[in-house]
Amino acid sequence: MIWVAVVITMLLFILVAKPTGIYLEKAFQGSKKLDKVFGPFEKLIFKITGVKEYNQTWKQYALSLVLLNGFMIVVVYFVFRLQGVLPLNPANIKGMEPTLAFNTAISFMADTNLQHYSGENGLSYLSQLIGITFLMFAAPATTLALVMAFIRGLAGKELGNFFVDFTRALTRVFLPIAFMAALVFVALGVPQTLDGVVTAQTIDGAKQSILRGPVASFVSIKELGNNGGGFFGANSTHPFENPGQMSNILQMMLMMLLPTALPFTYGRMVGNKKQGRILFVSLFMVFLLGFITITTSELNGNPVLNGMGIEHVQGSTEGKEVRFGTVFSSLYATVTTAAETGAVNTMHDTLTPIGGLVPLVNMMLNTVYGGVGAGFVNIIMYAIIAVFISGLMVGRTPEFLGKKIEGKEMKLIAVTILFHPLLILGFSALALSTHLGTEAISNSGFHGLTQVVYEYTSSAANNGSGFEGLADNTPFWNITTGLVMFLGRYFSLITMLAVAASLKEKTVVPETVGTFRTDNSLFGGIFIGTIVIVGALTFFPMLVLGPIAEFLTLK
């Protein structure tokens, strides 16, 4: 029965992807019906804010994005610092420590949601609403806006206006879908209230304080926007965030909704629907491989306990919620790191070595399917690399969407693809070479190394999940992960927007018999091979020293 439920869940991922992709294309490219519904409200916003609807250059678009995001980071930082004296604080929670406020503000603006605090006692209701929930809408709207400009550039069209795209992302995508999802979560038992703590009497007569709050609205945008931060410290393992299997499946669907839809949006916008389908199918195969790997490892149980003759019918159940089981916990871990969300319904630190390797690899690749917008930018980056390598092998100038891929584009892509591992491995080396980093490690040996690398991988990939055995709420970890999140977020977005702008100016080369097609299964295979060879092998030495060595030791 459990496998039937898994297959149905997978089919739901597939079935909603194309319709959502079509909707996104209409929402951003102009639809009379949508303009009639949302247009008046958007015009009012533009009038109040002074936004003028004109086409921007890529530099203007990028500058608008960075300045708006930077302003939001500063505002939310002071909300966190001053929450102790601000209203909507029934639990009398004090203001955040400076480096923690710095880390948290960047974390949520970068769509990472890395949390070095516990939601129950770290934030007031005002901070949860104005700080966290606000950024949970703004962060994915930023990248969804940018990816639309990116695709327009690839299609040879004007990039558009950041503020217009940002507003449309909010009004036409995130607000309506999150609102409907929140209502469903309330129906499934997720609380939604501004009332304070409830004092309950337990069976043995003791008193227990139970925190509640505006959880349903928080969870809906947390998953839809690939944010992932938890209202509670236990994240989606907490019964108030994720009461049962129905809410669990809905959360996974929301996480996958936009990342899986974007290949179809791309196909329609560039006039090559088949290429969009090829990208979707290729990535789904990689996703499926990851799920099979982690599930097999978790169902086989812990090798040490197996050697003692302990029964493991349910597999490795350490750190997992009984109401979800091993299989759905494995699926959730695959989804949350493939879609770069970071929400967890099981503790990733307790996964088996190979089970923990899958989420780590998903974040290192940052492209299967990746987070809202940012992930798709990486997908096209790998697609262009695949075309470039194929062109070199047959002695032809590489072409993508009829545009020649030349030195300028490849230099930008080379810098971008090297920057991600440089952030992860460079900061991991820094942490491991100083007591400020090593004193936070709770496990010695191979697993301790994985804890450190996982933290920086999660930060660079804007995922936010963690091997929570790491004592990371210190100035060193707050500052370094904050820098990694900021750089990992904005560097690749800006450089790839420059690539799209460069391709926009090029003339389309007529297709000939010798043109390498990017809309067939051959390209799909080369695309997957490029992801594995260029992406995964970059991190292979570290994976050998971490989870693979731990697996061999336990075995």
Swiss-Prot record:
Keyword entries, A-Z: Cell membrane, Ion transport, Membrane, Potassium, Potassium transport, Transmembrane, Transmembrane helix, Transport
GO molecular function: P-type potassium transmembrane transporter activity; potassium ion binding
Membrane-spanning intervals of the chain: 2-22, 60-80, 130-150, 173-193, 246-266, 278-298, 374-394, 412-432, 483-503, 525-545
Subunit (UniProt): The system is composed of three essential subunits: KdpA, KdpB and KdpC.
Compartment(s) of residence: Cell membrane
One Gene Ontology cellular component: plasma membrane
Membrane topology: Multi-pass membrane protein
Main location: membrane
Keyword Nucleotidyltransferase included in the entry's annotation: no
Source taxon at top rank: Bacteria
One Pfam family recorded for the sequence: KdpA
Family: Belongs to the KdpA family.
Designated name of the protein: Potassium-transporting ATPase potassium-binding subunit
Entry function: Part of the high-affinity ATP-driven potassium transport (or Kdp) system, which catalyzes the hydrolysis of ATP coupled with the electrogenic transport of potassium into the cytoplasm. This subunit binds the extracellular potassium ions and delivers the ions to the membrane domain of KdpB through an intramembrane tunnel.
